[in-house]
Amino acid sequence: MQRAAALVRRGCGPRTPSSWGRSQSSAAAEASAVLKVRPERSRRERILTLESMNPQVKAVEYAVRGPIVLKAGEIELELQRGIKKPFTEVIRANIGDAQAMGQQPITFLRQVMALCTYPNLLDSPSFPEDAKKRARRILQACGGNSLGSYSASQGVNCIREDVAAYITRRDGGVPADPDNIYLTTGASDGISTILKILVSGGGKSRTGVMIPIPQYPLYSAVISELDAIQVNYYLDEENCWALNVNELRRAVQEAKDHCDPKVLCIINPGNPTGQVQSRKCIEDVIHFAWEEKLFLLADEVYQDNVYSPDCRFHSFKKVLYEMGPEYSSNVELASFHSTSKGYMGECGYRGGYMEVINLHPEIKGQLVKLLSVRLCPPVSGQAAMDIVVNPPVAGEESFEQFSREKESVLGNLAKKAKLTEDLFNQVPGIHCNPLQGAMYAFPRIFIPAKAVEAAQAHQMAPDMFYCMKLLEETGICVVPGSGFGQREGTYHFRMTILPPVEKLKTVLQKVKDFHINFLEKYA
């Protein structure tokens, strides 16, 4: 093609009109001859296609950011272009992102982060001394006294020490070893990392991972990615989403026919279900794990989000140690926490940690090796995690303001949890269990037979159809229960309770009006 074009250009010099035409004609003929000799080749097949890609990645689904969220993005763009809708904004109630919903950051955390990010501010009188003290300690532990340097793969040493001290305080003196602490890119990174080490075997010896249904879709996504076997155990919706050990026994016995159940995942407080497990339940689960030789994963990122006066958070680590050495020396446990939830709501920093106990020394080396492949978690996220576990204490300059802000966030969440539960339960065809903790409602919804048929005609799950209609008619984005798992024949959706109270009231009223109209339309 390049040669042909050059031949055509040759005829463009200064010539008489007649000679120019003959020259152009001659050049064009020669170019045509070249093209006949070297025909343009068709584009070759792409190396990476849906057929050739990693099938485990293709099997991954993550409902929290799935099709309905993509549709919400499309609608937002349409609103920006001036396309008329029955609403003026999309309310993203699909995800637990507190600050995106208007929650203000905790002042002390942002002060320390500002000081760590721009150390020249350490000379400013505008910052309290306790914030400066923490910032200096973090920076002194970083290479070059900068958050911009890599840390050790396991995390900054002094931050791991602070995490261990926090766990010891939280658990009433039960010791925590900094060497068992691994700082992570959010809790999700820790969960996927530990599962990578746990999954092995093939055929009937392939690792089975027990997860609650409903579950947080991270678990099913990682299980698919690792080509492990998902083993479902169902929470008891009729008993406030309680975990029943008899259901665990059923699940593990049935799974042994086709896999090797090796891992038991617990989410406490529950996501999406909002239940808080009793101490007795946790003891029963630990005994079951010991009995069946299961590795326990305790997802405890909502440990500060407990609202019911009748409930209290009990860490698996604390209960395990209080059950005595037969359990505390033998049951392998990884527990997880994060900067994203609680009262801090710092999702964007991607800070987290995992504590892993009773790990074989040789496996600990393998875990550190795996972590070293990604070098280290974001050092800014590690710093944010430090402030979560090492906040101001009584007698420090920032303590009163910090306490007010913390109590305000958690108090408002408790009010919104009760408001959501009460208003949903006033709507015919909606039932919502008590929201004991976390930051979501997971109401059960009645979907008429005609709506189920309409959903099938659109090749959608009935609750996806319901949630899509809710989005298109009200602008409210929630996640269908089918994305979390649910018992056959039941339908739910997950909705965050994070919007400000007045906006939450508006959301709940819109859901109520939509649901009543939906029932009438498909009666």
UniProtKB/Swiss-Prot annotation:
The modification N6-(pyridoxal phosphate)lysine is found at K341. The modification N6-acetyllysine is found at K415, K505, K512. Its EC number is 2.6.1.2. One of its GO terms (biological process) is L-alanine metabolic process. Pyridoxal 5'-phosphate binds at A187, S188, Y216, N271, S338, R350. The keyword Acetylation applies. It is an enzyme of class 2 (transferase). Expressed at high levels in muscle, adipose tissue, kidney and brain and at lower levels in the liver and breast. It catalyses: L-alanine + 2-oxoglutarate = pyruvate + L-glutamate. Pathway: Amino-acid degradation; L-alanine degradation via transaminase pathway; pyruvate from L-alanine: step 1/1. Residues 1-25 are annotated as: Disordered. Its cofactor is pyridoxal 5'-phosphate. Keywords: Acetylation, Aminotransferase, Disease variant, Intellectual disability, Pyridoxal phosphate, Transferase. CDD domains: AAT_like. One of its GO terms (molecular function) is L-alanine:2-oxoglutarate aminotransferase activity. GO terms for cellular component: mitochondrial matrix; mitochondrion. PANTHER family: ALANINE AMINOTRANSFERASE, ALANINE AMINOTRANSFERASE 2. Catalyzes the reversible transamination between alanine and 2-oxoglutarate to form pyruvate and glutamate. Homodimer. Belongs to the class-I pyridoxal-phosphate-dependent aminotransferase family. Alanine aminotransferase subfamily. It is linked to Neurodevelopmental disorder with spastic paraplegia and microcephaly: An autosomal recessive syndrome characterized by severe psychomotor developmental delay, dysarthria, walking difficulties, moderately to severely impaired intellectual development, poor or absent speech, and progressive microcephaly. This is Alanine aminotransferase 2. It comes from Homo sapiens.
